[in-house]
Amino acid sequence: MIPFWKKTGKHSKPQSAQKRRQNAKPAVPRTAQQSIPMQRMFEDGTCRVKPNYYTRTIQYQDINYQLAQQEDKTAIFEEWCSFLNFFDSSIKFELSFVNMATDSTEFEKSIRIPFQKDGFDDVRAEYSQMLRQQLAKGNNGLTKTKFITFGVEGESMAQVKPRLDHIQNDLLNNFHRLGVQAKPLNGVQRLKLMHDMFNMDGASKFHFDWKDLVKSGLSVKDAIAPTAFAFKNSRTFQMGGIYCAASFLSITASDISDQLLKDFLDMDSSQIVTMHIQSVDQNRAIKTVKRTITELDRSKIEEQKKAIRAGYDIDIIPSDLATYGRDAKALLKELQSQNERMFLVTFLVLNTGRTEQELENNVFQASSIAQKHNCNLCRLDYQQEQGLMSSLPLADCQIEIQRGLTTSSTAIFIPFTTQELYQSGKESLYYGLNALSNNLIMVDRKRLKNPNGLILGTPGSGKSFSAKREITNAFLVTDDDIIICDPEAEYAPLVERLHGQVIHIGPASTQYINPMDINSNYSEEDNPLALKADFILSLCELVVGGKEGLQPVEKTVIDRCVHVVYRKYFENPTPENMPLLEDLYNALLTQDEPEARHVAAALEIYVKGSLNIFNHHTNVDIHNRIVCFDIKQLGKQLKKLGMLIVQDAVWGRVTANRSAGKSTRYYADEFHLLLKEEQTAAYSVEIWKRFRKWGGIPTALTQNVKDLLASPEVSNIFENSDFVYMLNQANGDRQILAKQLNISPHQLSYVTHSGEGEGLLFFGNVILPFVDHFPKDLELYRILTTKLNEISEGAQK
């Protein structure tokens, strides 16, 4: 093992006059601007740090390394090793991890729901209060960002630009292979980053425009420099109103854990962790190791000679010598045959505090983390300014303390921990707190490729509450229409509070929906009747029943009659001409096939009998923004039929809204009831697929995962749902879901005997554990809850 590499100067070649001028020590800076070690920033993000040295910076996002399965962790680690091996000895690079306190006022403003003077501002105020309470539980006041900065030498910008472009594109592709989102920073973004690092006290806001440089005669440094640097003592310094201390990590552990970097980044204070990494030319590294082995062998021979002269066994040599010899030979083998390279690493930590005591506490915490991993955090005595400037994302290390590490040893500082889900935007909704970081989860399902969603969980796990919370949030911040299919009469209090419309469908109700309703937008094809016929076939399958469902001849006669009964309406599309189930019944009776009379006989009870509630023209105006279909009174015989008819009514609303450019959110509780009959399941799956194209955002709630995966066709609902809100799961369902969604055992623990409002969120390719403990002292909670004791308590108040 080669622990440290030192820069040699003893046998170096004589330097030219130009080189001597470039390497001459700069004059002591007289201003804060002069302290900043950069010369020029270009608009494309290229920075000339010093003569003939240019750098660029890429910002990258986190991925879920800590939650991944072991084989996935291994794959990420190996891919990161390949990422590091990409850099040859001509490229210097730096990994920067910047944790900075966000202005709490600004952050609260970003989550506050603006008033709209529509009669619901009191609800908005209470929902914003809930968000502030949840924010206080986490550390969202700390913004964590990650960057990689790389630099190459060249005589001019024109010479280095093609190479920088090439390296940048390769790095972006390498990040893409890791599943990491990354973007290069332009000049303004790099300047803002450095401004924020220099002005952690928040006293100065960043204002910069390229056009102002020429007029004002100022430089870019004037836009980023703090009010002052004060390097008054050897161990700390002041930067604006912040106290700081720069330290380096002495890596003395024989075995480094992949948790070391994570533990540093989990600290709840503003800090900058920096890793400067320089690849060593492979031939030079191998020669150096061989030279070290030769020197160790020479020392071993000397020790053996001493042993002979002293008259003791020549195999007894100092243990350190034997250990170093084994390590050096193992290192040589790795470099020669195991795709390992040698890197020189400088690991820096810049701690901050608003007072000297707070700074010392933060440094002590960082030192404890280092000691926990058998390393030492050493203060950069008399090098605080160099430590600060080396922490800037400029890939310019001014600290000459380097540790030699192989690719694998360097890659163990894995820069990925926990992915966050926080999307800023008007329509981002709240889904709880990240269980790993306690940060708010705020996302907009419309940004997904497929916004369809599932809410899964055992009874009492919080399915209905989660759906109601999302409905409330969507109602308050979006213009979307919201329709609910409510088989258990749970949503009426919320809908009424939001001045919505509750439609009670049951034998004793006088509110009717005509399942034969159709509009010209019903299908994107020229013939909307084809999709309507598919729905009516599904309806007849539920009516006729039987294990085999509808027979081919029965399907044929039903389809024939559908075209007959709609003929009059399409000739003159008025509400009076809209057909009823009775028209279909009569048309079936006119057919010659006995199968037609069989279907008509099955339909009779729904036309002339006691279950004729669906044989009426629609008499409710379902154009309210939030509509709830309460089908609890339908009973078992009619509930599936009612759910199917509601689904069709929703489809009609979705198609009408599409032409108006409006989204429609649909919530279907007890969704598994629609998946037991083949034709009905097939129709539901087809509608599920169509929703996305037409601006629909359906959400299915169910406790029966087995029904969702009962057939390959039904399992398409999973494949067409990029949003899954998974609460506590029964044992059998857990195993099914683990296989279907590739959930690791560690991830599965978050839905095993979990409490209410706790589970896993699947958002696109991101999997996050969440916790949503909604404050119970709010009026909104009493409206959302389905617990009888809490509902009765709320009524008494």
Predicted regions and their residues:
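Conserved lysine of the Walker
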Residues: 463
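A short helix-turn-beta junction within AAA+ P-loop NTPase domains corresponding to the substrate/partner-engaging
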Residues: 499-503, 713-726
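P-loop NTPase motor domains
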Residues: 63, 70-89, 96, 100, ...
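Extended, folded cores of ATP/NTP-driven motor/assembly subunits in large transport
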Residues: 2-418
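Hydrophobic positions on the alpha1 helix immediately C-terminal to the Walker A/P-loop
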Residues: 466
